[in-house]
Amino acid sequence: ETFIMPGPPPARAVPSTLIPCTQDRDFMIYDWASRHEAACRIVRETHPDLLFIGDSITHFWGGAPVDEPHRDILQKSPETWNLCTAGMRAVNLGFGYDRVENALWRLRHGELDGAEDNAVCVVLLGTNNLAENTDGEILEGIRAVCREITGKLAKAVIILQGFYPRNSAREGTAERIAGINLLLNRLAAEENFIYTEPGRVMANSDGYVPEELSSDGLHPSAAGYARIAAVLAPVIRQAAEREK
């Protein structure tokens, strides 16, 4: 009788959320590589104490760097951005159509270099991974982003935002987002981050995002950003006091 030694278990594939990479999915309205270079330069030169790390929801709000010639499209509410960041040196590290792995690449290639060691870092990522990844893969990618931040900025205070609501034809999207937000809340508790869900103020009681707050059911309008800022500004002030 032939005895066959059992082999090692099959290697678990590394999820895409943990493989840093660049992207150019939004090339029609901005240049990803140029924005990255501008962001690195601003961080080096201004030594920010407030960083917003995210995708288009963050990118389209306001602040520097500014993408020319599409300033009007990509700066939906610079007034509320200024109110939310008042008294701090803020940089907008939001990049349209970024997935978690794209933000991870950016942070590993200079976007944190020069920031204050105790900077407040506001993180909102993952909605662009919903169609590509499992909830667990998204969570692990966001965890990796947060560890990248604390690995480079030892005293950073991380504000982890839950996913914003989105009007979707895909059944179960709202329930999935609610489940992911529970996971993010748990991650924040484990890692001593601050967790917040300002996106809740974007939706009606039935979970629908009205047109006056978002023309596409996800990205805030100026009125939507005003609501977000009203929730987020006091959380940022609370975070800034942690290291004083």
Over which residues does each language-model region extend?
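Charged helix-capping and loop-helix junction motifs
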Residues: 137-145, 174-181
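Proline-centered flexible-loop/turn and helix-kink motifs
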Residues: 86, 154-155, 189
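Catalytic His-Asp segment of secreted/periplasmic serine-dependent ester chemistry enzymes
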Residues: 165-244
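Glycine-rich anion/phosphate-binding loops
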Residues: 98-105, 133-142
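Surface-exposed cleft-lining segments at the edges of enzyme active sites
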Residues: 92-95, 125-138, 166-173
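Mature catalytic domains of secreted/periplasmic carbohydrate-active enzymes
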Residues: 9-12, 21-22, 26-31, 142, ...
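Serine-esterase "nucleophile elbow" of acetyl-processing enzymes
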Residues: 2-96, 101-116
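Structural recognition of the beta-strand scaffold that forms the well-ordered cores
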Residues: 49-54, 89-94, 119-125, 129, ...
